[in-house]
């Protein structure tokens, strides 16, 4: 049983949610990148709902089992995988963040669960190399004359 983990997961997820909303709106409104705003908003909003549930769960019970902690980190991994699918796949500069739940898992959970989460992350990364919605940057790519 991990006594601190749920509170830490809640804090980490709030940071991730803030970063995700900021990146989505910055890309769409400032950089004029055409991304599926409604779909990405729904995916991040689901994370907000899960985090509120976790917050009220923590108020009732400070301890959390390894399996429950793993399920939270698995959700975070899948949620980020869906966001990356919607926003350009593996070429998205934020794709490296798929490692964050694995690193958190390595810090708190047994090696077996960390290996399982690592394998799932690897499968997501490989899938994102082939299946994703390409970003429409609104401009043609060209090389300047030298």
Positions of PLM-derived features:
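Alpha-helical transmembrane segments of multi-pass membrane proteins
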Residues: 47-51, 103-106, 125
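Canonical alpha-helical transmembrane segments
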Residues: 47-62
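Short, Lys/Arg-rich, polar N-terminal cytosolic tail immediately upstream
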Residues: 1-5
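Generic transmembrane alpha-helix motif of multi-pass integral membrane proteins
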Residues: 79-90, 96-116
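Core segments of transmembrane alpha-helices
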Residues: 17-21, 74-80
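Alpha-helical transmembrane segments and their interfaces in multipass membrane proteins
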Residues: 6, 18, 22-44, 60-69, ...
């Amino acid at each position: 049983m991990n006594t601190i983990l749920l509170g830490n997961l809640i804090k980490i997820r709030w940071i991730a949610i803030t970063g995700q909303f900021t990146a989505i709106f910055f890309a769409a409104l400032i950089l004029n990148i055409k991304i599926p705003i409604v779909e990405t908003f729904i995916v991040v909003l689901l994370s907000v709902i899960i985090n509120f549930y976790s917050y009220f769960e923590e108020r009732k019970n400070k301890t959390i089992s390894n399996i429950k902690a793993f399920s939270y980190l698995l959700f975070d991994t899948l949620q980020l995988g869906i966001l990356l699918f919607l926003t350009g796949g593996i070429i998205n500069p934020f794709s490296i963040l798929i490692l964050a739940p694995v690193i958190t898992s390595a810090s708190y959970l047994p090696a077996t669960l960390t290996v399982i989460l690592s394998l799932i992350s690897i499968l997501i990364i490989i899938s994102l190399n082939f299946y994703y919605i390409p970003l429409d940057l609104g401009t043609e790519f060209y090389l300047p004359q030298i």
